[in-house]
Amino acid sequence: MSIFSSLFKVIKKVISKVVATLKKIFKKIWPLLLIVAIIYFAPYLAGFFTSAGFTGIGGIFSSIATTITPTLTSFLSTAWSGVGSLASTAWSGFQSLGMGTQLAVVSGAAALIAPEETAQLVTEIGTTVGDIAGTIIGGVAKALPGWIWIAAGGLAVWALWPSSDSKE
């Protein structure tokens, strides 16, 4: 399986889980949303029912429109601006992070939502990087003579060996 296939599986799984969660939430709060919609559109419903000849129902919606709708509209406006401000702050904070940190945050979120698909993606990336590194190292190892490798190894040991002139 390729990296792109694994990546699309992760994205598909994350989106499907988010949509499923939103469906569950929507099913739970459906009555509340219906009541809010009726109150929010009460001025229009009052005019509609009055013009249709249902003056009693139009009067009920008219009283809702004058008492509850302004409060609800103010609350929804305040809530919407607060959510917009929060989302804007979160997005600008995320954008200010480095590319590696952004990748770590997104990978962590994906691992929480879709652990199996994320593990498969990480395995694919590790395998691909290992194959590429093996190909490059194998090509370089065949191109250089052996004495250069021995000299480079000796130089690395000399550079990494702790010195005996420690000043304590």
Curated annotation (Swiss-Prot):
Superkingdom of origin: Viruses
Subcellular location: Virion membrane
GO cellular component, one term: virion membrane
Membrane topology classification: Multi-pass membrane protein
Keywords attached to this entry: Fusion of virus membrane with host membrane, Fusion of virus membrane with host outer membrane, Membrane, Transmembrane, Transmembrane helix, Viral envelope protein, Viral penetration into host cytoplasm, Virion, Virus entry into host cell
Major location category of this protein: virion
Transmembrane regions listed in the UniProt entry: 29-49, 52-72, 94-114, 143-163
Biological process, per Gene Ontology: fusion of virus membrane with host outer membrane; symbiont entry into host cell
Purpose: Mediates the fusion with the host outer membrane during virus entry into the host cell.
Subunit composition and interactions: Interacts with P3.
Name this polypeptide is given: Fusion protein P6
Source organism of the structure: Pseudomonas phage phi6
Lineage per the UniProt record: Viruses, Riboviria, Orthornavirae, Duplornaviricota, Vidaverviricetes
